Amino acid sequence: MKCLLLAAGYSKRLYPLTKNFPKPLLEVGGKPVITHILEKLEGINDIKEIYLVTNDKFYNHFINWKNKLNNNIDIEIINDGTTSENDRLGAMGDVNFVINKKSINEPLFIIGGDNLFDFG
């Protein structure tokens, strides 16, 4: 199974905190929200690949985050090419974008990149 983390929003509701920084990379409990999510996913043996879709504005932030990770799952950061709220694809548009770009034809576990949760 593959997993898609949605992180292509422009985080406008948390301005000015997120004006130049993506919401999924804000720290909660000493680490980014997206890292909490990734740690939960590492416990699911069926997940073999993880994609994170973001926009052009925040793409390099996620690349830097990925380069600092110490984990066993490879994450591919995908840039949807959008640069503002005006041309954003939206959640379902980004899902479709990644499915087509990666030719996904198997179950896909989709998670919002700014959602904290517990499986227990």
PLM regions: where:
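Active-site glycine-centered loops adjacent to acidic/histidine catalytic or metal-binding residues
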Residues: G9, D114
